[in-house]
Amino acid sequence: MSNGRVYIVGAGCGDFDLITMRGAEYIRHCDVLVYDSLIDVSLLGFAPETAERICVGKRSGRHSEKQENINEILVEKAREGKTVVRLKGGDPFVFGRGGEEIEALKSADIPFDIVPGISSSIAVPELAGIPVTHRNLSRSVHIITGHTAQDTLPENIKKCAETDGTLVFLMGLRNLPDIAENL
């Protein structure tokens, strides 16, 4: 039996209608849907009734599956010849660990495609009417983690404040007082 294929799909930043048409189409034709808790659950309804649905959690402080286990699920299901959609909140490559997932797929010789999602780093300010770049005001945007894997602030946070661009912090609520103090 030949390997299936994995589609790593960004679900966008909240509402189900912010997913791309391509992402929705892949969900409609999948055999297995591996999804995070951060997605809009309405997206699950796009999958065929026969599709296997696997929730792998991924909420701040409540990771129901370790990343290594998620990688194994993707590889195992694809080796069964199935079409797998890995549905991730936001964009898979903006603090979404999509890079780790494609490394596992490459190591296992599993074919994959990536469907970008709308990242909250751009969409949230935009929906609030705040441009992340603006002619003559902000010529760049910097997306920074609000905490590292060791649950600390990034070491270069003070240098970030010296840029002439817009700073966007993701996953920083718990460290917000420290972030503000260091800027």
Where do the PLM segments sit?
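Class I S-adenosyl-L-methionine
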Residues: 1-16, 21-118, 123
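Beta-strand/loop-alpha-helix module characteristic of Rossmann-like adenine-cofactor folds
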Residues: 2-6, 112-113, 119-183
